[in-house]
Amino acid sequence: MPILGKLFCGKHGAANWVDLAEAGRKEMLKKDIQPRPAYLKWAYIGMMTIAFWNGGLGLPWFTKYVLQVGVLGMALLFMLVTGDFRRLKTVGQFAVMFGLPFVMMAALSMLYWALDFQQLNYMSRGCSTILYHVISLSAMCSAVYLFGRRSIDYTLYGMCGANCCIVLGSIKENGIGAFVTGLIAFAKSGGIDTNAAIKALEVHDLTFAFGLMLLFALCCERGKKRLLYAALSGLFFFLGLKRIALIGLVGVFLMGEFIRRRKPKVQSILILLISIGAIVICFGYVYLIQSGLFNEIVHALEIDTMGRDRLYAAFQEVYDFSPAFRGYGIGYVTRYISIMTEAGVGVFGTHNFGGMHNDIVTMYIELGFWGFAFWIWYSWNGRIVWCQKEFGMQTALLLLYETIYGFITYATDNTVFYCYINTVFMLLPIAMAIGEQEQGEEKGKHERKEPETSKERRVVAS
């Protein structure tokens, strides 16, 4: 083991395994975190850059998940050769917290598939959808284990590197003149006027992820890092502008500023009120769409839903707003759309929608009334309250901000199972909780040392 330690970790070695043998697990867990070799950081940034730039290299779509498995392997190997388990408890707690909905989705889906005698290829597709997000969760837990709060920095660097590559690719294909002209028109029109060069920058999933990074920079970072990260995230968020993401970002920022200025007790009350209100709104939103009232409202107000109204109407016969509605399992909506599109039935014959562009209703259809109720409650109340009790108000508020932003995008898009937004969504609170813990431990060490230093000074003076 020491030989492996020297090969993989250089001077950092595998001394913790000796401590484990001599002092036991509890004493070992009290030791300082082992320093990480610099090349691990660069390896992670490189892997994330390729993962976020997946399509630009002409690589298979699943390459990003292969690289995320690589991050997991890198963390496991480092732990194996160093015996450093210090961050595992916190990382494990978050893994369970974020993993619980995936377990619920898999269990309910398997039950529904069995009752409906579904085909094996349909069931495997639903399971793979859940598995991909378990991989993303494992990768982000591994990144936080390796780098602590700095994992946010390194992930952002990878995202920026990927988007820079996308920008350079657009310039290469369309020319610098077309790019500059399109960028000026894009900025003047507020994201409405685009040419081919700017259209190439509209990377939906990555743009939503940059929105989360910008949200974190504005609400949680302080000092020079806040300005730098807000500038980087804001630039790429603007270039890939998604209007619903912008609405979500502005709404969360204003609400965050309001909550942040309140006292802790008031903050706890506000979290509870927001969660109750959000649960009611989500159920009300599903009812409006299923009953057809939503379409009546948007038609009366002459709002352009870009075809969503017709899509919602086509699904009205598929589900009911009732406690007796049990759902169809994960992946049903996209499969239904694919079958109807191939058959050219109704609105599906006019356009390939790809998804329902409303993941709140999609989750209701796939999980059923009670599965949806659990998902909504857990998202808005269960995990946020748990975070508050275990890791403090700041981590809980960050998770609340992310949830508000996420659900605003769910209302008009297919982001629940987007890879990049979920990767960043899971990363931020884990890294922040670890950062708060380690900062508190460091502060405690200094406080314990100060009395000893004062005593030594008194002895010298006497």
Where are these regions (language model features)?
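Aromatic-anchored transmembrane helix interface
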Residues: G70-V71, Q93-A107, F117-Y145, Y154-L156
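N-terminal signal-anchor transmembrane segment
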Residues: I3-C9, W17-D84, M104-W113, S170, ...
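Long extracytoplasmic/lumenal interhelical loops at the membrane interface
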Residues: H299-L367
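A membrane-periplasm/extracellular boundary helix in multi-pass inner-membrane enzymes
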Residues: L168-K172, E257-L301
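Transmembrane alpha-helices of multi-pass inner-membrane enzymes
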Residues: W42, L399-S462
